[in-house]
């Protein structure tokens, strides 16, 4: 497979928008988290991402509000601002039998460790994973554009991830980000 090494913002802008095609489940209680993790533990490979409420004050940051974990069919949006990082989620992150694929995982895990200690296992960093394929770009939007000729919308990135109710646009954005990581891994 011959791939482009890089892609311009202008090229990405002209592409059709990618959207997660599966079911999205918002997880707001510990019992919901337990059921969701039971399903996720049965999967071989998962896409993972997180969202944090943006801070517009220098030196101030918020804890991770949302952890997105996606299979090919379902994406679970764990509202960590409501449930915290529950033991079942920690057990999934530590499970060496379930591969977790994401982009900038070091940053995600650094922020998640502020919620609870854990030792993540079986994680694949896409920025490193795509390098042997000749891809030089490091952003999810550009890597996805190179491989699928579709763009990942970033319009919700700076929205309030701690809102009482997530909008449909937020849910779709969050699910697409986690699923896109999985999609990239499957293709390569």
Question: Model regions: which residues?
Answer:
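N-terminal accessory regions of nucleic-acid-interacting proteins
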Residues: 1-46, 115, 126, 179
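Short acidic, Gly/Ser-rich segments with clustered Asp/Glu that frequently serve as metal-coordination loops
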Residues: 45-58
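A short alpha/beta connector and helix-capping loop motif
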Residues: 56-73
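Nucleic-acid-processing active sites and adjacent nucleic-acid-binding tracks
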Residues: 74-94
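Short active-site oxyanion
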Residues: 95-100
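Short hydrophobic/aromatic-enriched beta-strand-loop microsegments
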Residues: 119-127
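Short alpha-helix plus adjacent loop in nuclease-associated cores
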Residues: 126-146
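Acidic, Mg2+-coordinating catalytic module of metal-dependent nucleases/exonucleases
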Residues: 145-188
């Amino acid at each position: 497979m011959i791939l482009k090494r890089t892609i311009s913002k202008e090229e990405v802008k002209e592409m059709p928008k990618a959207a997660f095609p599966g079911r999205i489940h918002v997880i707001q209680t510990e019992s919901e988290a337990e059921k969701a993790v039971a399903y996720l533990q049965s999967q071989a490979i998962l896409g993972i991402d997180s969202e944090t409420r943006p801070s517009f004050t220098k030196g101030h940051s918020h804890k991770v509000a949302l952890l997105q974990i996606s299979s090919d069919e379902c994406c679970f949006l764990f509202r960590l601002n409501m449930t915290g990082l529950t033991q079942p989620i920690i057990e999934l992150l530590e499970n060496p039998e379930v591969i977790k694929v994401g982009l900038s995982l070091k940053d995600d895990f650094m922020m998640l460790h502020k919620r609870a200690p854990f030792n993540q296992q079986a994680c694949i960093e896409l920025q490193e994973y795509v390098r042997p394929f000749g891809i030089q770009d490091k952003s999810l939007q550009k890597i996805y554009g190179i491989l699928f000729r579709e763009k990942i919308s970033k319009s919700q990135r700076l929205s309030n991830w701690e809102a009482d109710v997530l909008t449909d646009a937020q849910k779709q954005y969050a699910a697409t980000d986690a699923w896109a990581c999985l999609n990239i891994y499957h293709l390569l």
